[in-house]
Regions:
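A compositional/biophysical signature of low hydrophobicity enriched in polar/charged and small residues
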Residues: 1-162
Length: 162
């Protein structure tokens, strides 16, 4: 069952989603509560497993990995029993940012960041396609990644207008 949040918890989570480095005093001011109350709330959200960590977003371009791709991976039927082992194996490759375990035609969606198309090709052919348990791959290059950090969409907002 999903945790129930009051308006203050929602506001805290929304602010931290936008800026996880926000000092407690600034967070408290942003949500309109006392700093001591804010700290207690954040610690309670951590203890409940709602806040699982604070992460740094790194510019892939700045570390010479500007090209991202999403690679759909389908495993052969004879390795399905080892499907979780494949996920753990994939995530260990230095090019891999995320591994998504899927329902549907493909078993995984692997998000990679590489220097260029040569490195992408080599990764797919030398690591994924060369694995006897991998039946198929399909690679899509990411042109742009947009992210909406609203955790609790306004139910009265209706569909977006373009």
């Amino acid at each position: 069952m999903a945790a129930q949040f009051d308006a203050v918890d929602r506001a805290i989570l929304a602010e931290l989603a936008r800026n996880a480095r926000l000092p407690n005093n600034a967070l408290a001011a942003a949500v309109g509560i006392a700093p001591s109350t804010c700290l207690t709330r954040v610690r309670a959200l951590q203890a409940a497993g709602v806040i699982t960590g604070f992460r740094t977003e790194v510019s892939m371009r700045a570390i010479d990995r500007p090209l991202q791709a999403m690679i759909s991976v389908g495993l052969s039927a004879d390795v399905r029993a080892d499907i979780r082992d494949y996920a753990r194996r994939f995530i260990r490759y230095p090019q891999v940012l995320d591994v998504y375990y899927l329902a549907g035609r493909d078993d995984f969606l692997v998000n990679v960041a590489v220097r260029d198309t040569d490195e992408l090709r080599d990764f797919v052919t030398d690591y994924l396609s060369a694995d006897p348990g991998v039946a198929r791959t399909e690679t899509s290059i990411v042109f742009e990644h947009l992210r909406d950090l609203r955790l609790f969409p306004d139910p009265d907002a209706g569909p977006p207008v373009f």
